[in-house]
Protein backbone atom coordinates (compact mmCIF):
# COMPACT_ATOMS: atom_id res chain seq x y z
CA UNK A 1 0.00 0.00 0.00
CA UNK A 2 2.78 2.37 0.99
CA UNK A 3 4.74 1.38 -2.15
CA UNK A 4 1.69 2.09 -4.33
CA UNK A 5 1.23 5.51 -2.74
CA UNK A 6 4.92 6.30 -3.21
CA UNK A 7 4.71 5.29 -6.87
CA UNK A 8 1.68 7.52 -7.34
CA UNK A 9 3.47 10.37 -5.57
CA UNK A 10 6.60 10.11 -7.71
CA UNK A 11 4.52 9.76 -10.89
CA UNK A 12 2.62 12.93 -10.02
CA UNK A 13 5.88 14.68 -9.13
CA UNK A 14 7.44 13.62 -12.44
CA UNK A 15 4.43 14.93 -14.36
CA UNK A 16 4.66 18.29 -12.57
CA UNK A 17 8.39 18.50 -13.31
CA UNK A 18 7.83 17.74 -17.00
CA UNK A 19 5.13 20.40 -17.25
CA UNK A 20 7.35 22.88 -15.41
CA UNK A 21 10.18 22.03 -17.80
CA UNK A 22 8.01 22.64 -20.86
CA UNK A 23 6.73 25.92 -19.40
CA UNK A 24 10.28 27.02 -18.57
CA UNK A 25 11.44 26.09 -22.07
CA UNK A 26 8.74 28.18 -23.75
CA UNK A 27 9.32 31.10 -21.40
CA UNK A 28 13.09 30.86 -21.88
CA UNK A 29 12.68 30.92 -25.66
CA UNK A 30 10.44 33.97 -25.43
CA UNK A 31 12.98 35.81 -23.30
CA UNK A 32 15.85 34.72 -25.48
CA UNK A 33 14.30 35.63 -28.86
CA UNK A 34 14.69 39.41 -28.42
CA UNK A 35 18.36 38.86 -27.51
CA UNK A 36 19.00 38.23 -31.20
CA UNK A 37 18.53 41.97 -31.65
CA UNK A 38 19.95 45.16 -30.19
CA UNK A 39 17.74 48.16 -29.44
CA UNK A 40 19.38 51.26 -30.92
CA UNK A 41 16.79 53.75 -29.69
CA UNK A 42 13.16 54.83 -29.96
CA UNK A 43 11.49 56.07 -33.11
CA UNK A 44 11.29 59.88 -33.14
CA UNK A 45 7.93 61.61 -33.34
CA UNK A 46 6.87 62.90 -36.74
CA UNK A 47 3.84 63.86 -38.79
CA UNK A 48 4.33 64.28 -42.54
CA UNK A 49 2.31 63.98 -45.76
CA UNK A 50 2.30 60.85 -47.93
CA UNK A 51 1.72 60.22 -51.65
CA UNK A 52 -2.04 60.18 -51.08
CA UNK A 53 -1.90 63.62 -49.45
CA UNK A 54 -2.72 62.01 -46.10
CA UNK A 55 -1.10 62.99 -42.81
CA UNK A 56 1.04 60.11 -41.55
CA UNK A 57 2.58 60.08 -38.07
CA UNK A 58 4.83 57.65 -36.25
CA UNK A 59 1.85 56.62 -34.12
CA UNK A 60 0.15 55.27 -37.27
CA UNK A 61 2.72 52.47 -37.29
CA UNK A 62 1.96 51.48 -33.69
CA UNK A 63 1.87 47.70 -33.29
CA UNK A 64 3.47 47.15 -36.70
CA UNK A 65 6.89 45.99 -37.80
CA UNK A 66 8.16 48.60 -40.25
CA UNK A 67 11.16 49.72 -42.26
CA UNK A 68 12.55 53.22 -42.83
CA UNK A 69 14.69 54.72 -45.57
CA UNK A 70 15.55 58.15 -46.98
CA UNK A 71 15.48 58.81 -50.72
CA UNK A 72 14.33 61.28 -53.39
CA UNK A 73 12.57 60.65 -56.69
CA UNK A 74 15.13 62.36 -58.97
CA UNK A 75 18.08 60.54 -57.39
CA UNK A 76 20.28 59.29 -60.26
CA UNK A 77 22.48 56.92 -58.26
CA UNK A 78 21.51 54.58 -55.41
CA UNK A 79 17.79 55.37 -55.00
CA UNK A 80 16.54 53.22 -57.91
CA UNK A 81 18.40 50.25 -56.42
CA UNK A 82 17.13 51.02 -52.92
CA UNK A 83 13.53 51.30 -54.10
CA UNK A 84 13.75 48.08 -56.13
CA UNK A 85 15.12 46.29 -53.07
CA UNK A 86 12.42 47.77 -50.84
CA UNK A 87 9.83 46.51 -53.35
CA UNK A 88 11.39 43.06 -52.86
CA UNK A 89 10.84 43.47 -49.10
CA UNK A 90 7.24 44.54 -49.76
CA UNK A 91 6.66 41.51 -52.01
CA UNK A 92 8.15 39.12 -49.44
CA UNK A 93 5.09 39.87 -47.27
CA UNK A 94 2.08 39.75 -49.64
CA UNK A 95 -0.32 40.00 -46.71
CA UNK A 96 0.78 43.66 -46.36
CA UNK A 97 1.52 42.99 -42.69
CA UNK A 98 4.54 45.29 -42.49
CA UNK A 99 4.83 49.04 -42.83
CA UNK A 100 7.36 51.08 -44.80
CA UNK A 101 8.18 54.77 -44.43
CA UNK A 102 10.30 56.33 -47.18
CA UNK A 103 11.23 59.93 -46.39
CA UNK A 104 12.04 62.26 -49.30
CA UNK A 105 15.13 64.40 -48.69
CA UNK A 106 14.02 66.68 -51.55
CA UNK A 107 10.58 67.62 -50.25
CA UNK A 108 10.36 70.83 -52.27
CA UNK A 109 10.35 68.83 -55.50
CA UNK A 110 8.73 65.66 -54.19
CA UNK A 111 5.12 66.71 -53.85
CA UNK A 112 2.41 64.16 -53.01
CA UNK A 113 1.47 64.06 -56.70
CA UNK A 114 5.05 63.35 -57.77
CA UNK A 115 5.41 60.70 -55.07
CA UNK A 116 2.21 59.02 -56.26
CA UNK A 117 3.57 58.85 -59.82
CA UNK A 118 6.82 57.42 -58.48
CA UNK A 119 4.92 54.77 -56.51
CA UNK A 120 3.03 53.63 -59.61
CA UNK A 121 6.20 53.57 -61.69
CA UNK A 122 8.18 51.53 -59.14
CA UNK A 123 5.55 48.94 -58.23
CA UNK A 124 4.73 50.26 -54.78
CA UNK A 125 1.39 48.61 -54.01
CA UNK A 126 1.22 48.10 -50.24
CA UNK A 127 -1.29 50.40 -48.51
CA UNK A 128 1.18 50.56 -45.63
CA UNK A 129 4.10 51.92 -47.69
CA UNK A 130 4.10 55.68 -47.24
CA UNK A 131 6.32 57.98 -49.31
CA UNK A 132 6.64 61.01 -47.07
CA UNK A 133 7.24 64.67 -47.78
CA UNK A 134 6.96 67.85 -45.73
CA UNK A 135 9.12 70.39 -43.95
CA UNK A 136 12.74 70.05 -45.09
CA UNK A 137 14.28 70.91 -41.72
CA UNK A 138 12.07 68.35 -39.99
CA UNK A 139 13.04 65.60 -42.44
CA UNK A 140 16.77 66.25 -42.09
CA UNK A 141 16.40 66.34 -38.32
CA UNK A 142 14.71 62.94 -38.51
CA UNK A 143 17.43 61.55 -40.77
CA UNK A 144 20.49 62.76 -38.91
CA UNK A 145 19.32 62.83 -35.30
CA UNK A 146 16.11 60.81 -35.09
CA UNK A 147 17.11 57.70 -37.03
CA UNK A 148 20.84 58.48 -37.31
CA UNK A 149 20.82 57.76 -41.03
CA UNK A 150 22.97 60.33 -42.81
CA UNK A 151 21.41 62.80 -45.27
CA UNK A 152 22.59 66.15 -46.67
CA UNK A 153 20.71 68.53 -48.97
CA UNK A 154 21.95 69.93 -52.27
CA UNK A 155 20.96 72.26 -55.09
CA UNK A 156 20.97 69.62 -57.83
CA UNK A 157 20.19 65.87 -57.78
CA UNK A 158 23.90 65.04 -57.88
CA UNK A 159 24.62 67.25 -54.86
CA UNK A 160 22.25 65.51 -52.45
CA UNK A 161 23.96 63.04 -50.15
CA UNK A 162 22.41 60.16 -48.22
CA UNK A 163 23.19 56.64 -47.15
CA UNK A 164 21.55 53.60 -48.66
CA UNK A 165 20.69 52.19 -45.25
CA UNK A 166 17.37 50.76 -44.08
CA UNK A 167 16.27 50.89 -40.43
CA UNK A 168 14.11 48.16 -38.88
CA UNK A 169 11.45 49.09 -36.31
CA UNK A 170 9.72 46.59 -34.02
CA UNK A 171 6.10 46.63 -32.84
CA UNK A 172 7.08 48.61 -29.73
CA UNK A 173 8.56 51.48 -31.73
CA UNK A 174 12.19 50.49 -31.13
CA UNK A 175 14.83 50.94 -33.81
CA UNK A 176 16.52 47.56 -33.72
CA UNK A 177 19.43 45.73 -35.29
CA UNK A 178 20.55 42.13 -35.56
CA UNK A 179 23.80 41.10 -33.91
CA UNK A 180 26.91 40.04 -35.76
CA UNK A 181 28.67 36.82 -34.78
CA UNK A 182 30.89 38.81 -32.41
CA UNK A 183 27.81 40.10 -30.57
CA UNK A 184 28.03 43.66 -31.88
CA UNK A 185 25.10 45.19 -33.82
CA UNK A 186 25.19 45.70 -37.57
CA UNK A 187 23.20 48.91 -36.80
CA UNK A 188 21.41 49.20 -40.16
CA UNK A 189 20.68 47.07 -43.21
CA UNK A 190 22.42 47.89 -46.49
CA UNK A 191 19.59 48.75 -48.84
CA UNK A 192 21.76 48.56 -51.95
CA UNK A 193 23.06 45.04 -51.36
CA UNK A 194 21.32 41.69 -51.75
CA UNK A 195 22.85 40.39 -48.53
CA UNK A 196 21.42 43.31 -46.56
CA UNK A 197 17.95 42.73 -47.98
CA UNK A 198 18.12 39.01 -47.26
CA UNK A 199 19.06 39.73 -43.63
CA UNK A 200 16.28 42.30 -43.34
CA UNK A 201 13.61 39.91 -44.61
CA UNK A 202 14.90 37.16 -42.28
CA UNK A 203 14.74 39.49 -39.29
CA UNK A 204 11.25 40.72 -40.12
CA UNK A 205 10.11 37.09 -40.20
CA UNK A 206 11.71 36.50 -36.79
CA UNK A 207 9.93 39.53 -35.36
CA UNK A 208 6.61 38.42 -36.86
CA UNK A 209 6.99 34.98 -35.28
CA UNK A 210 7.93 36.56 -31.95
CA UNK A 211 4.90 38.87 -32.03
CA UNK A 212 2.59 35.84 -32.30
CA UNK A 213 3.78 34.38 -28.98
Annotate each language-model stretch with its function:
Residues 58-81, 85-86, 101:
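Short active-site neighborhood of thiol/selenol oxidoreductases, capturing the structured segment around
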Residues 49-50, 169:
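Hydrophobic alpha-helical segments, especially N-terminal targeting/anchoring helices
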Residues 1-47, 207-213:
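N-terminal targeting signals for export/organelle localization
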Residues 43-44, 66, 163-164:
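Short loop/turn microsegments at loop-to-beta-strand junctions
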Residues 118-121, 127-138, 151, 162, ...:
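Soluble extramembrane regions of membrane proteins in the secretory/endomembrane system
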Residues 155-213:
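Thiol-/selenol-based redox modules, centered on thioredoxin-like
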Residues 82-142:
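Structural microenvironment flanking redox-active thiols in thiol-disulfide oxidoreductases
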